[in-house]
Amino acid sequence: TLAGKYRKMHIPDDPGFYEKFYFTPGDIGFRPVDTSVGRLGVLVCWDQWYPEAARLMALAGAELLLYPTAIGWDPADAADEKTRQRDAWVLSHRGHAVANGLPVLSCNRVGHEPSPLAADRVAGASGIDFWGNSHVLGPQGEFVAEAGTGPTLLLAEVDLGRSEQVRRIWPFLRDRRIDAYGGLLERYLD
């Protein structure tokens, strides 16, 4: 049985992820999927970087934000650059959890995928190392469970009732100044 559908809204076009050549952005918006475990706000891969997407899922009644993804780095990147990339990824998820008072569950691919492009291989690019580090965050951005860089079955209990408790402490959704956010609909502001 199909519980629902979601079409990836943001399509990347950066080294190693030239998806705009193959995919068209989704056209059904940000709608949570009702399941037996709760209302799931699914944001696929690149969508997870956009706080607006997480917020729209929260406003539509999502009880959990789910981020299935395949993200990694060029193996030739310096160690400190790799750390910055992975830390920014986790930090954005923690920010989404806090800003929306929702648990965030992120599963990421692991392993190495060689570049399919002959030109990359000639230039010395070997492909992408997917960094794993799947995690479950509570509604205050705290780690509930975290995987390493290898294949892992990650299990965690998530208390959906905590979201309401956190939203009473931090009523960010209630206190939004929606009258002042018109500029978010513009590409740039003067």
Can you say where each PLM-predicted feature lies in the sequence?
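Basic phosphate/pyrophosphate-binding loop/patch that engages nucleotide-derived ligands
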Residues: T1-L2, G38, G95-H96
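A structural microfeature
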Residues: L2-G4, A145
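Catalytic cores of transferase enzymes with a strong primary signal for eukaryotic protein kinases
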Residues: K5-G29, V33-G38, Q48, A54-M57, ...
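A short, polar/charged loop-to-alpha-helix boundary motif
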Residues: R7-Y22, T152-I169
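Residue-level signal for alpha-helical context at structural boundaries
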Residues: T24, G111, S115, V158-D159, ...
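Cysteine/selenocysteine-centered motifs that mediate thiol-based redox chemistry or coordinate metal-sulfur cofactors
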Residues: P25-A60, S163-D190
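Active-site beta-strand termini and strand-to-loop segments that position acidic
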Residues: V33-S36, P139, V158
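CN hydrolase (nitrilase-like) catalytic-core segments centered on the catalytic cysteine
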Residues: C45-L154
